Swiss-Prot record:
Chain positions of all zinc fingers (Phorbol-ester/DAG-type): 12-59
Domain DH: 209-406
Matching CDD domains: C1_ARHGEF2, PH_ARHGEF2, RhoGEF
The species this protein was found in: Sus scrofa
Protein name, entry field: Rho guanine nucleotide exchange factor 2
Known function: Activates Rho-GTPases by promoting the exchange of GDP for GTP. May be involved in epithelial barrier permeability, cell motility and polarization, dendritic spine morphology, antigen presentation, leukemic cell differentiation, cell cycle regulation, innate immune response, and cancer. Binds Rac-GTPases, but does not seem to promote nucleotide exchange activity toward Rac-GTPases. May stimulate instead the cortical activity of Rac. Inactive toward CDC42, TC10, or Ras-GTPases.
Length: 961
């Protein structure tokens, strides 16, 4: 019992088990508590889970009691210590144990502490100890050390109280000292109230409205800077220095406030400077700002826009966590609660608490589009200003859209990391044909959407699952013991978005079907509402449309594949850095040449421009290697023509010095002659002199032409840029080939020729295709070609198999036909023998009892039965011919009958040995011997009998008498 009781003590808490309702929340994890795992500490009145007791902080009331007891014990011990000599023993005043002003200043930093408990003299531990030496009792030393520790703790509490003593207004005034004039100038509510009434009446109504909006922009920017200053200088500094909070906790409360403060302070300074420039002479209040678009474009474009996007994205994405952390600190830490109350007690900061400041900073970026739109609405007459404001409005909207997108991605990334941390490390699910899918695969993808749904199983039951819509898959997770696992159901838990079809269930408002192609499965899931179902269908369809292919994004990636992917990404990053460096180098070279021309007196030469899209490998305007090389060759030829003259080979000019030639009658200057008629040579080459401004050339219209030096410098800059662009293109092409086609040099050689070759359409002015896009298309075409070749080979094999099978069937058919013909002939001969042996007189054909019914087995035979049923046998002649037919048949076949009896045996045995099913059995009797033919072949052979009869009609026949 003692051990069980001791186990209930955790961090000073005395926990007891209680019964609670289902709505009771845990103080530690903020989740609902069931009746079996509820614990309560009666000392501090905290209710938590049984599993959360180790994570709870120390009991506050127990800690306070211990501190009070220790302080009381220390005071008692100090009172019993004599620090003076025996003759002048007296009790030391209580003020002597308090810290000095210098010690408090070291804790308070630069603030001026004026606590009523401050001391005039300092005291140290050795001063308290007095005449004690090393032989003093150890217990007394311990008491003194504990007393100094308690003094430090009390000094920290007093430093917090000193913050309100010196006044939040004083601190606020110190923070806003840099913008003191701005605060006074923008104290009025609007521009109409800030300027003089006489000055106001001089302007139109549209100008008043425009200036009111500009005034509001500057005023709100000033208030925003004030909010940031309060967050940085007042709250954050106080938490770090006064409360001694961890820097990570304070950074979680106020992320990126320094960067935001710098951005908006710089922008506010520019606005105030523009306002100062717009002041009317002799008046510190009256101003009209006519141009503001240029400042807005500078603020919301370029590096400033990139910095704003980065800082606001991070701040807004951590907005929810910051508020949650603030509420937790305010609920748990009494010192933090006291600090916030004292700081916000003043009238200046009453509406600027921590939560209000965080919300104001988050909403600030959304105010710019509204203000700029209103300024543009009331701006008339200045077209350039309207264009600048329109451009600035577009830039602000683009910035806001990018920030929203970044915030959404960061929030989804944080949500994905949270899910990953809660997943069971051993959780895996098999993917058909791919292998196990573990939780590491989640971090490779981006989370697009997630939510709790009901999965209807094959048995008709509903399972609570968490569905994650990611880059290329749908993942189903199930919560078990506060951990996420893959549900063990009858269908895979990972569904590929490749060719995924999503359909709503017609008779249900919340249900939808997910039809997967690989493997072919159909999932039925149900959302919480109809709106949730519509949202899921919309985001799934959008993700299916942009789903990457399996070649670019495999479903499951091994460690080697991940390593190769990282290397490829690093190579691409290095290529981009190389391109940026080359572009910067070419720009510096162009500026250098421009500066040299200006020093030489050619100030009219514009800055050389570089080809647009020269270093942009992602754009469609990026030239390929062969085009860059051809352009560079043309620039070299043009430079050669400019230096040595057209029509002169560069090889000759490098070997033989050019001679000065006089100007011809047509006014053309020959090689070696300068523009002013002077020829200068140096080491066999012609030196190009600088043309004077008075002797500059002009065209027929009188326009100023470029001097030869300017033309040469322009071509030199172009050549420099083209060569570096060629270097960048070659580097990117090499990386592309090594990354995409590592299987052999032949394929890389083909790709090189394809990428460097410009078609006729490109030369005609069509936009060239990017190398990476061309390589992707080439790989796709090669893959399609391989698939078509394989399909063609498969079709050929199938055709050969079908032809072989058809040949074998045809051979079997011929064999069966031959066997059947042989059997039919034998059966016919047997029937003739039976007819000759069994009946001396034939039966009348018209006798109904002589007709044998059709064998049922013949009904299954093919067209032979139809011919048999439609055949009408020839009718024998009346009277005498009717009796002569069987006699003729009998006389004709008697020799054959005798021979058959001797060699083949009885006809019955011959019929039994036959394999033909129509030859019958012994049970059919004599009627089977007169059965008609069952096939057309039998009919054609039976026609010979009447012919033989007719051929013997001329012979004399003996009468019966």
């Amino acid at each position: 019992m003692k051990e069980a009781k001791d186990a209930r003590y955790t961090n000073g808490h005395l926990f007891t088990t209680i019964s609670v309702s289902g709505m009771t929340m845990c103080y530690a994890c903020n989740k609902s508590i069931t009746a079996k795992e509820a614990l309560i500490c009666p000392t501090c009145n905290v209710t938590i889970h049984n599993r959360c007791k180790d994570t709870l902080a120390n009991c506050t009331k127990v800690k306070q009691k211990q501190q009070k007891a220790a302080l009381l014990k220390n005071n008692t011990a100090l009172q019993s210590v004599s620090l003076r000599s025996k003759t002048t023993t007296r009790e030391r005043p209580s003020s002597a144990i308090y810290p000095s002003d210098s010690f408090r200043q070291s804790l308070l930093g630069s603030r001026r502490g004026r606590s009523p408990l401050s001391l005039a003299k300092s005291v140290s531990t050795t001063n308290i100890a007095g005449h004690f030496n090393d032989e003093s009792p150890l217990g007394l030393r311990r008491i003194l050390s504990q007393s100094t520790d308690s003094l430090n703790m009390r000094n920290r509490t007093l430093s917090v109280e000193s913050l309100i003593d010196e006044g939040a207004e004083v601190i606020y005034n110190e923070l806003m000292s840099d913008f003191e004039m701005g605060e006074k100038d923008f104290a009025a509510d609007s521009w109409s109230l800030a300027v003089d009434s006489s000055f106001l009446q001089q302007h139109k109504k549209e100008v008043m409205k425009q200036q009111d909006v500009i005034y509001e922009l500057i005023q709100t920017e000033l208030h925003h800077v004030r909010t940031l200053k309060i967050m940085t200088r007042l709250f954050r500094t106080g938490m770090l220095e006064e409360l001694q909070l961890e820097p990570g906790v304070v950074q979680g409360l106020f992320p990126c406030v320094d960067e935001l403060s710098d951005i908006h302070t710089r922008f506010l300074s520019q606005l105030l400077e523009r306002r100062r420039q717009a002041l009317c002479p002799g008046s510190p209040r009256n101003f009209v700002i006519h141009r503001l678009g240029d400042l807005l474009i500078t603020q919301f474009s370029g590096p400033s826009a990139d910095q704003m996007r980065k800082t606001y994205s991070e701040f807004c994405s951590r907005h929810t966590k910051a508020l949650k952390l603030y509420k937790e600190l305010y609920a748990r830490d009494k010192r933090f609660q006291q600090f916030i109350r004292k700081v916000t007690r003043s009238a200046v900061l009453k509406r600027h608490g921590v939560q209000e400041c965080i919300l104001l900073v988050t909403q600030r970026i959304t105010k710019y589009p509204v203000l700029i739109s209103r300024i543009l609405q009331h701006t008339h007459g200045i077209e350039e200003e309207r264009q600048d404001l329109t451009t600035a409005l577009g830039l602000v909207k683009e910035l806001l859209s990018n920030v929203d997108q970044d915030v959404h991605e960061l929030e989804k990334g944080a949500r994905l990391q949270e899910i990953y941390n809660r997943m069971d490390p051993r959780a895996q699910t098999p993917v058909p044909g791919k292998g196990p899918f573990g939780r590491e695969e989640l971090l490779r993808r981006k989370l697009i959407h997630d939510g709790c749904l009901l999965w209807k199983t094959a048995a008709g039951r509903f399972k609570d699952v968490l569905m994650l819509l990611m880059t290329d898959v749908l993942v189903f997770l199930q919560e078990k013991d506060q951990k996420y696992i893959f549900p063990a159901l009858d269908k895979p838990s990972v569904v590929s978005l490749q060719n995924l079809i999503v359909r709503d269930i017609a008779n249900q408002e919340k249900g939808m079907f997910l039809i997967s192609a690989a493997p072919p499965e159909m999932y039925e899931v149900h959302t919480a509402s109809r709106d949730d179902r519509s949202t899921w269908i919309r985001v799934i369809q959008q993700s299916v449309r942009v789903c990457p292919s399996r070649e670019d994004f495999p479903l499951i990636e091994t460690e080697d594949e991940a390593y190769l992917r990282r290397i490829k990404m690093e190579l691409q990053q290095k290529d981009r850095a190389l391109v940026e460096l080359l572009q910067e180098k070419v720009g510096l070279f162009a500026e250098m040449t421009h500066f040299q021309v200006e020093e030489d007196g050619g100030g009219g030469m514009p800055l050389p421009t570089l080809p647009r899209g020269l270093f942009r490998s992602e754009s469609l305007e990026s030239p390929r290697g062969e085009r860059l090389l051809q352009d560079a060759i043309r620039e070299v030829e043009g430079l050669k023509d400019l230096l040595v003259g057209p029509g002169v080979e560069l090889l000759l000019t490098s070997r033989e010095p050019a001679l000065p030639v006089e100007t011809d009658s047509g006014g053309n200057t020959s090689p070696g002659v300068t523009a002013n008629g002077e020829a200068r040579t140096f080491n066999g080459s012609i030196e190009l002199c600088r043309a004077d401004s008075d002797s500059s050339q002009k065209d027929r219209n009188g326009n100023q032409l470029r001097s030869p030096q300017e033309e040469a410098l322009q071509r030199l800059v172009n050549l420099y840029g083209l060569l570096h662009g060629l270097q960048a293109a070659v580097a990117q092409q090499d990386t592309l080939m090594e990354a995409r086609f590592p299987e052999g040099p032949e394929r890389r050689e083909k790709l090189t020729r394809a990428n460097s070759r410009d078609g006729e359409a490109g030369r005609a002015g069509a936009a060239p295709v990017a190398p990476e896009k061309q390589a992707t298309e080439l790989a796709l075409l090669q893959r399609q070609h391989a698939l078509l070749q394989e399909e063609l080979r498969r079709c050929r094999r199938l055709g050969e198999e079908r032809a072989t099978e058809a040949g074998s069937l045809e051979a079997r058919l011929r064999e069966s036909e031959q066997a059947r013909a042989l059997l039919e002939r034998e059966v016919e001969e047997a029937r003739r023998q039976l007819a000759a042996l069994g009946h001396t007189e034939p039966l009348p054909a018209e006798a109904p009892w002589a007709r044998r019914p059709l064998d049922p087995r013949r009904r299954s035979l093919p067209a032979g039965d139809a011919l048999y049923l439609s055949f009408t046998p020839p009718q024998p002649s009346r009277g005498h011919d009717r009796l002569d037919l069987p006699v003729t048949i009998r006389s004709v076949h008697r020799p054959f009958e005798d021979r058959e009896r001797q060699e083949l045996g009885s006809p019955d045995e011959r019929l039994q040995d036959s394999s033909d099913p129509d030859t019958g059995s012994e049970e059919e009797g004599s009627s089977s011997r007169l059965s008609p033919p069952h096939s057309p072949r039998d009919f054609t052979r039976m026609q010979d009998i009447p012919e033989e009869t007719e051929s013997r009609d001329g012979e004399p026949v003996a009468s019966e008498s």
